[in-house]
Amino acid sequence: LTNVSVPGSYPIAVMPGLLRQAAVLLVTLADRPAFRATVPSKVQTYMAIGRPILASLNGEGARLVQEAGAGLATPAEDAAALAQALLQLYRLAPEERARLGANGRRYFETHFERSRLVDRLLGHFRLFVDSHRSEQ
């Protein structure tokens, strides 16, 4: 393949720039029970970057990609399904791939952006404190 790049290891500071050069970003996890309950940090990173995601994983990570409309998710370790999904993304118009990336970015901003997470956490703490005050 001449249009696939695996850039290797780089300092974290340069990663956003490298990731933004990609048309599609790949995240994979092995098919293990423990991995079904986890969301790889790459999923959140890729959403923040605003690029379509091609995910080969099961469970929460796959559900998140699908729920966000941020790309395509295939079962972990299913090479045929991964190849089909890659072709499907390749055949999309650039505008459609951009839409998938934008969906992921919006989902990230709504669900994972730090200041919003802090605000939600503080809201939960306030509810907890208020509910215990009313019990006294």
Task: Tell where the protein language model's regions lie, with residue ranges.
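Short alpha-helical segment that forms part of, or immediately flanks, the ligand-binding pocket
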Residues: 13-16, 20, 40-49, 59-63
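Short acidic/histidine- and often glycine-rich active-site loop of Leloir-type glycosyltransferases
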Residues: 37, 58-68, 73
